Amino acid sequence: MIFRALIILSFFSLINCENGKSELPPVVLGYIALDYLILTDPDRSSVYFSTVRSLDLDIAYETDAEPFTGNYIVGGSNIWNVTDSNLQDVFADRGYPVAVTVPTDLSEMNEIPNQNRSTWSVNQLLDLVPRYRKKSSNFQSTSFFIVYVRGQLADAPGVIAVTISGVLGIGPPVIFVFKDMIEQFSNIASPDRVKKAEQMTVTHELGHALGLVNAGIPLYSSHQDKDHGNHCTNSSCGMFWALSETKVETFSPASPLIFGQECRDDIRNYNP
């Protein structure tokens, strides 16, 4: 897909979330600090929810920044079942099937060389796309590219992940996950917590890529947190602007759906 617009740089939510650990900076625990949204081409979401019949994830990871795989210790479910279940739910009840494919093992993902960066500019992140993206998309099938890197976003150290769209030539939105930021959720006493945080983050970013909240999928009810850009006012929703340790700790992979009813209503009532 070719986007015809310039990019708007939107500082939606520079996070200043207290994490309760004196040795860590208070900006660490939060969700997106910025999103890149397209000025025009609103058909981005309308394609995903009309003509697309298959969706998969093309995942790459920098050496030593690999995603968590395997099973959760508590409950034993597959870690990537969280992302898969939420995507399956997104495309359920549309009157036609959409095949969703989510890789669950590192053998299904692409390891890329260590980039030796402690900070990343947006352009440096985008340089990875033509080098390592393996799959293309069309109006029948969509492949979202997710890249795990070490380091942090320059001038925004609290960013856990970022979704970039609207850039000529990159295709569908690209998600970058900063593994160093994810690891701030690590806890020896609760080894599943960092894995849950990573999956909640990936699912949140995919929500943005698909068009939530009011970023392509129109609002069915008034629930956009305009102070934080395209995020939901429902603090229990996976599209809320911040992710706290408590929220991650209480999340159960046995009940993997993280989008609140407001966001799910947006999707269910969107028929482009």
Residue ranges of model-derived segments:
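Sec-dependent signal peptide recognition
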Residues: M1-I8
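C-terminal motif of bacterial Sec signal peptides marking the signal peptidase cleavage site
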Residues: S13-N16
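Bacterial signal peptide processing site
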Residues: E18-K21
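Active-site-proximal segment of zinc-dependent metalloprotease catalytic domains
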Residues: Y48-F49, R133-I217
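Stable alpha-helical elements in mature extracytoplasmic
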Residues: G75-L87, L128, E198-V202, L206, ...
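The catalytic-center signature of Zn2+-dependent metalloproteases
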Residues: E183-R264
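Short, solvent-exposed mixed-charge patches
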Residues: N271-P272
